[in-house]
Amino acid sequence: MEQKIYNEYVEILKEELLPAMGCTEPIAVAYAAAVAVQALGEKPESVEVNVSANIIKNVKSVVVPCTGGLRGIGAAVCAGIVAGCPEKELEILEEITEEQKVEMKEMLDTMPMTIQESDKGYIFDIQIKVCAGEHSGYAEIAGFHTNVICVKKDDAIIHEKEYEEQGSSCVTDRSLLTVEKIVEFADCVDVADVEEVLQRQIDYNWAIAEEGMTGKWGAAIGKTLMEAYGNSVHNRAKAMAAAGSDARMNGCELPVVINSGSGNQGMTTSLPVIVYAKELNVSREMMLRALVVSNLITIHMKTGIGRLSAYCGAISAGCGAGAGICYLYGGRAYEISHVIVNAVAINSGVVCDGAKASCAAKIASAVEAGLLGLQMQKNGKQFYGGDGLVEKGVENTIRNIGELAKKGMRETDKTIIQIMTR
């Protein structure tokens, strides 16, 4: 593999596999609020919030961690104001005290706050203005969760950069990602170059999945799967991924390592691979290489889909998980390509109606599609070009899914948001 491409792939993993405390959209709102307060330089007396429709959708129903069970945009704003420390970015709420939780609740009940939909037309946009007396602080995040594009104190610009419409977090060229090159990279990568980010993903995501399986979180999809369908590796792979989401969507304070800006996607793409690696008793190095495959396949698919969409992000991550497990079984580019095509043909079209408890069930469905796609490939079965969205060549099919999500589901997204906010 060319050194330039090799280096870019390493960098992509480092850019995307970030730790985050809680569902990433409300955490991004909290982060923006903390940045705005830092610019103001004093405790705010009122807040004005303008966010894109997809932020409204993804923050409305999910529990903001470390808030004592509070939900919604207002709760996320108050959490960020009280927490401060914007330098922590997506881990901004990791050291909240009980006293601060009480302060958040009081602030939510008493702070004058307006929340409106942004008129900028961005898919991902968070604007927060905090005011005290005659002074104000302003912060805007656009495109992705930590992309602060503007900070102001009154009318004085502290920080400003041009917003790129594609909203990508990368400094790399994502067009370099292909299934064939991803598998080649997984085969040749010096594990030391990716070990830190992948081991953190294993540690964090496994811990929250175990918490989801043992604690009382949400609809307990992970537990339900285990009770109903037993201890097979197939079922455990689904259940552990779902259990992580059970905990995360319902306020668990454990961090996860995200993928493509999403903790649910980070867990979906990694936990099934870890379960199978343990079952197959493969070496740690082999597990890490399989996680390279699963993570990069998910990132590759999400690049065309976009960060936020009406298309459920877990579907891509389930494909990534199936690809990573195929790698564990000795599959390489040819076999993995068929797994991906099979999986997306099964489950594409599942909608995203925001972050909430039922995401865990969608994750289980996404992992099931990945595993069924794998079993089809192992049995010599496949879907062919012309079968719906499937087109000959895995890259063509991935492109079609991106087009469906980004273009075809725009009106679907609007309708979902209208239903959720009426």
Task: Give, region by region, the residue ranges found by the protein language model.
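Acidic-glycine-rich active-site phosphate/pyrophosphate-binding loop
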Residues: M1-E11, K43-I56, S232-G251, S283-M301, ...
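Glycine/charged-rich beta-loop-alpha catalytic/anionic-binding loops adjacent to active sites
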Residues: Y9-P19, I55-V63, A247-I258, T298-L308, ...
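Conserved phosphate/anionic-ligand binding catalytic regions in large, soluble enzymes, centered on
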Residues: P19-V35, L254-L271, C312-S316
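A structural signal for small-residue-enriched, beta-sheet-centric alpha/beta enzyme cores
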Residues: A20-T24, V51-N58, P65, A142-T146, ...
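Early transmembrane hairpin of solute transport permeases
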Residues: I27-V130
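Hydrophobic alpha-helical bundle architecture
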Residues: A36-A39, P65, Y276-R289, I299-S365, ...
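Flexible, glycine/charged-enriched surface loops at secondary-structure junctions
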Residues: K43-V47, K88-L93, I115-Q116, A192-L198, ...
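Signature of multi-pass transmembrane helix bundles
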Residues: L108-G251, I416-R422
